[in-house]
Amino acid sequence: MTNKKTFALLLFWLFFIFAFSYLIPDFSNNYRYMMVEGEDRLIASFYDIVVSQYRHYFTWGGRTPPHVLASSLLYLGKGVTAFATAACYILLVYLIFKISCIEKQVFTKHLNKILFITTMLWICTRNYGEVFFMTVTACNYFFTTTFILFLCTYFAKSFGGNVNTDKQNFSKALIPLFFILGVIAGWCNENTGFAICFASFLAIVYFYFNKKLNAVHMSLFLGFCVGFLILVLSPGNHVRLENMEKGSFDYFEHIFTAIEIFFISLFENSLLLIAMAYLLYLSVKHKILRKYKEQYLQALYLFMVGFASLAIMIFSPNFPARSSTPFTFFSIATVLCLYNIVNKEEIKVMSSVKQKVLYGLALSYFVVTASNAYGALFTIRDDCKQRDVQIQKMISEGQKDLVVEPFRVQTSRYIFIADVRQDPKYFANQILTRYYHLNSIRRSCDYKKSNYPATDFHLIQDYGKKVCESSK
């Protein structure tokens, strides 16, 4: 019976993620990665993608692996992208479950854990709509962090002795493959690249002194480091930084803003942090820390990867909310790992009544926010269709400087809208100017800045009315 319920839950999320990913319109950066870098033409082959990302590495950024994936998915179309997103979501849930296990467990027999993972992903992931459904962002954070979880599983399991760390565990012929996979992982993203290098270095020191270190650990770690260096030393990253410094960017002032974003991210993951603290309290109370020393180190490793990926962003010149995604994913895994330790000792974590109440509240939250997001989704689809008709009509009339009407939906946690603004120099405007071969494009008006400390505090959309009214 549990298996059937588990399959039903996974099937629901597979369909939910597929539908949302398929129906959401493309915005800003998606259009950019549909085009060949340095040209105003659409990508027409995989060769174009290689050329485009080669140029991109030298002119704007170093995240080649996720950007190759993003351009490939955009080239292959919505159907393939939606299927890949949904499949990766199920893989993410599986990997979080697997990396948190302290002994062998059958995935489909643990409905409550799968329910916990999917619930926490929905509640705690900042800018959920952007992270999972905006193709370029999804490739930068969702797909890459899932891949990194896969590679970190070997490190995490090595603490508890759940993998054979003997040097002959893997064929020597596979060692170069682990190195290559490590390079790709380190090359994916600045914050996760740093985090896996930092946490895995500490793990390797521990394995060395406890005679657990093997060639797989070293090949992965060296791959992480090489990939991270390829990323941070890319000429494109230096160009990007120079462009920021040419403006009014003040690094000292930015640090205070970054610290604020850091604490907002901690606050939005506070349910997970509270759960960690409570499970550690139970561990101390029942005096099981020594007994499960290595399993607690496994949990610590998971937390260190997530926390390091978030903390390093304080020193980055750009700290978007989406960059907290790895922290959320690894924090969920940390909580489950701690729970598995406590549960192995048959320590009661929570009464069944309290558990049902919490899941009831979570279900209510999901129903309200998800149904509202779907309503907003169909509204923005209709708006984009009307916008496209409006643009094509003006282009057919020979216009090169376009003014478009505003949408009836704003960006929120579960719906991501990266619309053009009134300023034609805004980055989204410039992307569409290239895409449509125009002189300029702008929106007729801008809406007032939200009172929320961040857009993802906006949980419920008041959609249906234009986000702003033209002053003319």
Regions found by a protein language model. Name each.
Residues 110-159, 189, 267-272, 307-338:
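Membrane-interface micro-motifs in multi-pass membrane enzymes
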Residues 89-100, 147-159, 198-205, 275-283, ...:
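Transmembrane alpha-helical segments
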Residues 172-175, 294-295, 342-369:
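Signature aromatic-anchored transmembrane alpha helix within multi-pass, membrane-resident enzymes
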Residues 118-126, 182-186, 223-234, 304-314, ...:
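Aromatic-anchored segments of alpha-helical transmembrane domains
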Residues 5-7, 105-116, 170-174, 213-221, ...:
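Membrane-interfacial loop-to-transmembrane alpha-helix junctions, especially the N-terminal start
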Residues 2-60, 74-92, 101-111, 358-472:
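Intrinsically disordered, polar/acidic, low-complexity terminal segments
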Residues 19-83, 135, 185-300, 314-323:
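Transmembrane catalytic cores of multi-pass membrane glycosyltransferases
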